[in-house]
Amino acid sequence: MMHSHVTILADRQMTARRITQQAADRTAAARLARGPLPQTAARLAARLREHFDPHTLPVQQVLALAEEAGEFTAAYRRWAGLARRSGTWHDVEAELADVVITAYVTAHVLGIDLDAAARAKAEVVFTRGWREPPPAA
């Protein structure tokens, strides 16, 4: 009987330590995620470089970006009622955030200044004009 009380106490202590560690991990993650997205992406890319082969990391990131875009599309389809199961707007937001974060990390891994590339592309978009004339009033 005594053994079971000791076991229960040990399990509770282990659970408390795990919860405390998870809270500390979330706090550390929140600290790392603060600040401008390009700097956050640089930190994420640095972590990826620590854990993955530098020769395969670029292709892994390109494939991850394509995967995230697909997940965003699927989340939107579910929310819009175009899929067998339904989804929430929060899912759409979260998946789009994954696309943006993964795009920034991929750009960093590939040595692309995504902010500069996006500004240059926006300039092109605004100078090409709209393809369709506005509807008549």
What do the PLM-derived regions correspond to, one by one?
Residues M2-L96, V100-A137:
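Flexible "arm" and connector segments at domain edges
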